[in-house]
Amino acid sequence: MPYSQEERLIALTTPLGEDVLLLAGFSGHEGISRLFSFNLDLLSEKGPVNFSDIIGKNVTISVTQYDQTPRYLNGMVSHFGQSGSDSRFTRYQMQVVPWLWMLTRYADCKIFHNKTVSDIVRQVFDNRGFQDYKFQLNGSYNPMEYCVQYRETDFNFVSRLMEQNGIFYFFQHEEGKHTMVIADSSSAHEACPGQKTAGYNLASGGIDDSDVINSWSIEQELRSGKYTLTDYNFKTPSANLTASEPSVIHVGGNNKFEIFDFPGDYTSRGDGGVVAKLRMQEEEAAHMVANGSSVCRAFTTGYKFDLEDHYQASMNASYVLTEIQHVASVGDGYSLEHGGSGDTYSNHFTCIPLTVPFRPARLTPKPFVQGPQTAIVIGKSDYSDTSGDDGAGDSEEIWVDKFGRVVVRFPWDRAGACSCRVRVSQDWAGQGWGAITIPRVGQEVLVSFLEGDPDRPIITGRVYNADKTVPYDLPDFQTRSTFKTRSTSGGGADNYNELRFEDKIGSEQIFLRGEKDFDTRLKNDVREWIGNNRSLIVTQDQMEKAGGDLHSQVTGNVNEKVGQNLSIQVGQNLYEKSGMNFAHEAGQVIHLKAGMTVVLEAGTELTLKVGGNFIDINPAGISIVGTMVMINSGGAAGSGCGSSPTSPKDPDQADDGSKGGKMN
């Protein structure tokens, strides 16, 4: 006659069929915010089991309670093995875990934008095809501007997010299914199904004749009495973000103990108060725990029960089960075809008072970025989520916000989600002064992470690559240093500004090039010293204006050539003095005119000459020679061209350096 689990305390249902695998015993543990795991000892008289038919499948353990109703433990098979056989049975071992465990088999690098913790958890679960979960959240959670899953399993990622936010989870079991309950308050702790109360029975000695607790111990630990956090927000750099939360537990003078930590992972003092309270509750949750053993088959983590009949009346209160170790076995090990009288079940459990809010310990480490990474700056058209973004730029070549932040894409971001706006380290940063160069779209930048936190990137440098090459071929121009820009938008290789230094011995040079205008404004003196020649070429007009005097000294010659007119206006006196000769020659007219007096004075000789006629005055006398000399005999004086010098143009004003600068 085939063996059956029908009359047994424990049984297993699998996709292989009824009683193909007989449950001889199991042990395991479950805990709030922990993956449950049950190790099963199995027997089969049906022949070899194909492992692929059972691994990854859903199975259900049933434990018959004292009222003959079943209590279920449902899960997925993560491990299956065969250990041996005898004349009747082949022995197998099985490990049963929640569907959440499957997320330990996925690891990824992924970026989330403007999502709450519940949004992210839901997205991770749904993307992996898991739907058996529900939220019971009372708290309000702000969207996170930027959240990174970095080289970690999906399970670790959602675990640390929930731990960070004080969110816990446990499982509801039913036949063929288990549901993950995600909660953040004591209201989520319902009474154990079929076990609202549990009596304490010291005399039972572990005899499982009723649902009783047969051992109970309670312990209290001295914990810190205050939690203080602080952080820094570059958008409000002067704000004091320190937040503190005192403990509601007062024991052993714990008020003098304080935990101070940085960073608190918040951006405002109000949010800091919420985080400090969560951290304090996390500290308080473990201050008092009770440990016990029982035969209460309905005990399930995440649920509550009322302790009764304890000899110390203060112990009789409501408790939340936080951890349970289960052990059950078939007494005769199926040595008999029928039975069950020797079957046993017991557990060891840990619980906390219902009055103390449960907060999960932050046990899941956040990934630590070991060093800087490189990334590519992207433009607005490449950005997957621009909601609420205040970035602006002239074109797709530059995309920056008012803080000088740009958006980058990391090489590990296979989804192409891109980063948040990332601050850029500059050489100097003051109040409205300093240095700034904005990384442009397509450039490769060096990204560091504050305290190694993948959620806190900062650009600390820029690097060339095979697509974005150096301005001058190397090593040919290895002695050349330059600061060379590119005109935007649509600028080409010939559109740039540049400040260049050549340090090759004998060829040293400072080169300055502007694509359009060059403005210089000095509030005091300018002094120049040139050791050799100076050349100046102006292809159009040159205007100069001096508010005071203009002094010029030339040791050698002054040679000037004017292609058209030369106009000079003097408001008062015009003085010219030549050490030797002074010669003026005009192709047509020289006109001298004075409002009062014209004096021509010569030391030895003065000559007026027109053609063959002249008047010559010298120390020997005055000679007048002409074809005809007429004195008071009619005729008329010649006329000159007059003097109408053109007024000089005022030079353009240099850019005054005001905010915004010269943009045309």
Segments from the language model and where they lie:
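Extended, domain-scale alpha-helical bundle/helix-rich regions
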Residues: 69, 86, 115-134, 139, ...
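Short alpha-helix capping/helix-loop boundary micro-motifs
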Residues: 39-49, 284-295, 362, 428-434
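Short, well-ordered loop/turn sites that connect or cap secondary structure elements
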Residues: 53-54, 299, 315, 439
